[in-house]
Amino acid sequence: MKGNRRQPAVASQPTSPASPTPSKGTSKYANRDGSKIISVPKPSLSVETPQPSPTVSASMPPPTAGKGQPPSTAPTAPSGSNASGGEAAPTVNRKKAKRRAKLAAKAAAEAGLSGDNLSNGVAAHSASSSLPKQPSDAGHSDNEGEALSRPSQTNGHTSTGASKSKKGRKSKNEDGRFMDSAGSATGSNHHAEMRRPPSPIPHASPGRASGISKEKIWNTSSQEERQRIKEFWLGLGEEERKSLVKVEKDAVLKKMKEQQKQTCSCTVCGRKRTAIEEELEGLYDAYYEELESFANQPNPNGDVPPMLGPTGHFGSTAYTSQIMPSKYPPRQPSRGRIVEHCGDDEDDDGEDEYSEEELDDDEDYSDDEEPEEMHRQRPTEYQTDFFNFGNSLTVQGTRFHESLNSLPPYAKSYMEQVLKYVFRRDVDHSLGGILTVADDLLKNDGKKFIEMMEQLAERRMQREEDAKEQFARNYHINGNNYPAHAHPPPPEDDEEYEDEEEEEEYDSQDEEYDEEEVQTNPVHCACHCPCRGGDYGDAGMSASADDGSYQDHGQESHAKQHRHLQDSMTEEQRMEEGRRMFQIFAARMFEQRVLTAYREKVAKERQEKLLEELAQEDRETEKRKAKKQKEAQKRRDKALQKKQAQAEEKARKDAEKAAEEAERLAEEQRRQEEQRQKNEERKKKKEAQRKAEEEERQRKEAERLRRAQEQKERQAEQDRKAREAKEKEKKAKEEAKQREKAARELKEREARERKEKADKERLEKEAKIKAEKEAREAQRKAERASQKATTLANVPVPTGPARRQSQAPNPAPALPQSQQASVASPQLPTAVPALPKLPTPQKPRRTSQQEPFTSGFAAQQVHGQGAGQYPAPPKAATPVHTSPGPGGLLSKGSSSQGQSLHSQATSPLGTSLPTSTSLPTPFGMPHPPPNQHYPPGIGPLNAPPGLGGPRLFNDYPEQMYQQSPFGFRQATQQHPQLPPGLGIPMGPGRGLGHGPPPPPGLSAQQSDFPNMPASIFGSIPKEPSPLSSHSRQASANFDSPIAATPIARPTPIGRPGSVVQGRRGSSDSPGRPGQPGQDNLEEISAPHLGSSALLDDLDEPLMDDFMQDTRSARRSIPGPPQSSRFPPPAVGSFPMSNSPFGPSLWSQPGPSLVNQGFGGSFGQPAPPPGFNSLSDALSVNSPWTFASRPPPRHNLPQMRKVLIQACLDLASTKTPLLDEKAEDPSRRYLPITAVKKCVDTKFASGSTFTVDDLMSMTNTEGNANNGGGSFDTQEFDGELCVRWVPDDIGDSRTVGRSVGEIGSPIVGSRG
């Protein structure tokens, strides 16, 4: 029976390399370093292929065949028979065996000395796949640094004793690590005794699909990954496994057809395509049948299916004999068949190591799990996988070299060519990480596989041709069933020769591998499968003709090689090799399918795991949230409870506090009641005390009121008495005023009567005197003609007597003619002067003989002379050249003055009035002291310009001019320094007494300064010149209205003297000098007629304001009140535009004070000779300066005229106009600010006009006096504008006329 067939145990036999008995059926080969020993089985004559005993197979792990190792076909002796019994063993070349045994012994000795592990030298089918890794063996399989080769057994032949000893020693060095080997029962028993039994793994239930622990789903360890892949395959169902297996056929066929589309359509290619498709169909069908048969084969032990045979490969004879009868008869292995030791334990360890290191690349997985996955078996140590060959090549470092060196020369050359073709580089440079051949074939779109199929089809076609050829040569060939071992073994000499040739070839291949690179042909490489270990014929086909792989047969032709192949391997064997090659590729592709499915499964599980973890996280988050909410609710409940407890505690405390508060309130009420009672008692006491105090206060108040009433009564009485006294006094004053008024009226009436009487008498007397004068003049005319001219040219006659009594009568030289001519008025032409004649003494006349209208001034002079003054000696009278007064304004004074002068004509020439004779001061000023000196031209009696005599001021009342309108500061008593040019100190309390010199033609005043040289006004003699007894009016231009004015009445219509000159003291009326007489009172009280009607309404208030301003200026002087002695200027004597008092009241033209040396107060003209500058003299610290200056006042009509003129000027210039639409530029609106600036420039002295003043003037109705026309105002862009519109009827030419009031005489006008 099959189960009783056991191989003879030969383990106890002594082993010797030279022993002929054990080595009869094998040939041993060793590489140079001795690490690998190759046992080549010799051809066996046995027809039946022995199968291993099921018992042995079940109890002992079968040895794995080396990758690419063909299934063992060596027959074993039947049960109970010895190896030597039965059929004769094939002959062995003893010489080769002996030589190889020596080499093996030598190599073993060297390996023992160097510590290297050697193989036992037993010929066996080596397996390249690693054992299934168990948890107990994981540490050994994964941690071993270098895998060692394991002994193999082939065809039931046991190894020699030396080999066994080496194996035992090697196993000790490896800590009990062993490799499966197929051999005899002895070898198997030996391995069973030495190997530790593997711990079984429980069979995975089909319900556990994933078989993967969720806790280790992310683990990428190689060992756990293998385990998970196994569990995944075992967990798959029947249909899932079939789908994974059968999908390969369609994919390969489809890829093959796509590849064949690019070939030509010739008959050969068509046959090739057909052969390829048939080959694939047949191979896949057989492959699926084998898989199905293997899966469905009953398990002898009841738990797992039968294990693989010694070869461990699909399609092997051992395997197929177990599951199905082979359709090919058993064949004798080729005499060139060898057993590779490259797939031993050493390669397995390297593969495990590589699988652990390269698992992340997902390129290779351990080959130990695929058989278990495919067959759903529990992984055991004796199971192998389908991919040992590919993974056996995946080694690193020198171990790969060792693996290659362990191959025979033709196999090693083929592997090098394949690797070079795959990686396009040398083998030595690809040791860092080499993929398997199957992986490369799969990753290169199956090109390698397709080429292999093409080679198989070509070989099939070649086999058919060979069969025909052999049939033609009378060879017995069965096309379908090849006879087993039909080829007889070659002669022993040929075998020996071939062995020697193989040895030489092997040596030469080793040298070539070590020394030079081997060139390969990719097409031939794909044709020869490395899994079959290669034979001589295949090795010859796999190498190119010129690659130097064979030293002796490199130049043989292809036909010779083919014949050699036919001799060395039967067709059955070649078909078996192709079939086995296909199975390897199909297994590799199936492995990739399983791996892809596993990866998809893992990815899905990982995704589910991620989703589950996310869901778990969500659940945990929800749990945490719920927990937090629960905790928060607990906290809220706890806080609520706490609040409730606090509320209860608070309520309790509030209750206690309320109780305490009630007690306190009760106590407080009790205390308040007691306090109230005490307060009431105290209040009653206070009330009684208050009543007593109130009574006392009322009593005192009544007493106080009584006293106050009495005081009021007394005060009222006193007030009544005071009022009565005041009333009495007022009545007395009123009565006195009435009486005084009545007396004044009486006096005025009497004075008027006397004045009328005197006037009448004066007229009569004047007529008489005129007649007498004309008579006398006719008599003396011839006598005084020559004298009058010289006298009149050299000696000016003074118009009045001397004003100083203390000065000596020293005559002063007369002014030269040139000086008199320089000051003469150009508008007063003089007639041809009469020649002066010798004066004739005349008898002085009495005062009673004088005219009744002689002024008191002259009378005082006469009376003064008669009072004890010595009269001057009589001299010849010189006619006085007198010019008429201006405009008849002073006709009355000038006539009386002329009469006064004529009254003194009886006195001789050269005599003067006595020094004691004093003239009344103007405006009622007191007489100056005798020793008072004045600057030249500023004497107390000098009249203002235009008024020609001292009698000018005698007609004004004294009380009107008690204070000077000019606020000059008085000089000190110590006579301070006079201004430059004056040189004479001035007495204290004196102002500027002398005025400017009179106009040309009027007599000049004498100087009061005895030592004063001739002044700027001409020669001023100390004593007055003797008055001429005869005077006549000088000839004048009758065209001039002023020259035609008579000396006396009738005078032209003009302003009354009372209005023009103010109050004047009457010299005609009796009384004291300077006091107003009756005539003056009547004149003042009488209404003004005539030219007074021509006065403007604003003139009189201006006069009052003028006097008021002068008083205020005087009051503004610091210090005690002092009276100024400076006489006021003549009315209209200077224009008010240069005056601090505003415009002139009557606009009388005449020289202003600035022309008389008043300095910077009235302008700055050049000072006359002898005066440095009155502006220096009238400085702030000078006694001649004004203490204050009143603000200037302007005449409103004149101001309106100036405003009109300003509007016309602006309209005529390029001033920007706001009303551009007006046709007439003079009627355009002008900004009020520009008009104001123009008005300010016209008043050089500085105006105080404001915009409101100008606007008020624009509202004044125009007339002939103020310029006429009317003003229009309008606002443009927020700015007020004004324009002047002239009247249609009125004449606007009056605007441009010179200043002056209506009725004022103007020099040069025709009146």
From Swiss-Prot:
- Composition bias (Low complexity) maps to 8-27, 68-86, 805-829, 891-922, 934-945, 1041-1052
Main localization of the protein?
cytoplasm
* Segments of skewed composition (Pro residues): 923-933
Q: Where is the composition biased (Basic and acidic residues)?
A: 213-226, 613-682, 689-786
Record's compositionally biased regions (Polar residues): 46-58, 116-133, 960-975, 1026-1038
Q: Does the keyword Cytoplasm apply?
A: yes
Compositional bias, Basic residues, is annotated for 93-103
Which GO terms of the cellular component aspect does the record hold?
cytoplasm
Compositional bias (Acidic residues) at which positions? 343-372, 491-518
User: Which portions of the chain have biased composition (kind: Gly residues)?
Assistant: 984-994
Locations listed in the record:
Cytoplasm
InterPro entries attached here?
Answer: Fungal_stress_NST1 (IPR051195), NST1 (IPR025279)
Annotated signal peptide:
none
Q: What does this protein do?
A: May act as a negative regulator of salt tolerance.
From the Swiss-Prot or TrEMBL record, give the protein name.
Answer: Stress response protein NST1
